[in-house]
Amino acid sequence: MSKHHMEKLTCPSCHHDGDFEVWDSINTVLDPEMKEKVLNQSIFLYTCPNCGENFRLNYPILYHQMEDLVMIYLVPESEVEKTYEIFFEKNALADFHTEKYLNRIVTSANQLVEKIQIFDAGKDDRMLELVKLLATDSILKNDPDIEFDELRFAVDDDGTNILVIINKGEITGAVDIDNMYEFASSHCDDFKDLRDDEDIVINLSLIHISEPTRRRGISCAVFC
């Protein structure tokens, strides 16, 4: 079930107190309308009732897309290891193990949204982290002077899978990745089935590229 509670907040602009609804967990079967509020990140937005200023808040949340057996935990960076250990404690969340849930831990609202979009598109997030490496290499070869902070998965209006190029919080371009995804998939046949893999923290920092793979020009990476 979805859980939420109210918290008192003081506006940092006008110092007026107001109420903010904090969602501890969201179940998209029981509350289907909440999925869009997660995707547009409005559940993290507080509007001061006095001055009208908007403020973005970050707080932990468990996102449960029960119809697809997907659970994504948004926690602070400092809580990742603890959350991982709790999840794999003996008998902890046993039903979710037996049902082959797809579980992930993320540390930002943007990562949460990206994971939802990846799984809704039927993609493997492990493979997409490899695609980001390929895309980064391609972008820099075409424009060595380009500056960007992040590549983030999205689905274009016409259904094309893309990586948006983000620099200083602004989208500055996009890359069509369907061919790169197919290429990476064809060269990486040693991954476990997505729902059999016990790794639940998947990002670029967890990828090690093996030397034989480097020589082939594609990363069949080891996630650890």
Where are these regions (language model features)?
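N-terminal cysteine/histidine-rich coordination modules
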Residues: 1-76
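Domain-exit/linker segments immediately C-terminal to small folded modules
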Residues: 47-135
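Short, surface-exposed beta-strand/loop "edge" segments at domain boundaries and coil↔beta transitions
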Residues: 80-84, 169-176
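Long, low-hydrophobicity ectodomains and other hydrophilic envelope-associated domains
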Residues: 137-140, 145-147
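Electrostatic, structured charged patches in enzyme active sites and in nucleic-acid/phosphate-binding
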Residues: 181-195
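Conserved phosphate-interacting/catalytic interface
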Residues: 194-206
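Single conserved hydrophobic/aromatic residue that forms the stacking wall/gate
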Residues: 207-224
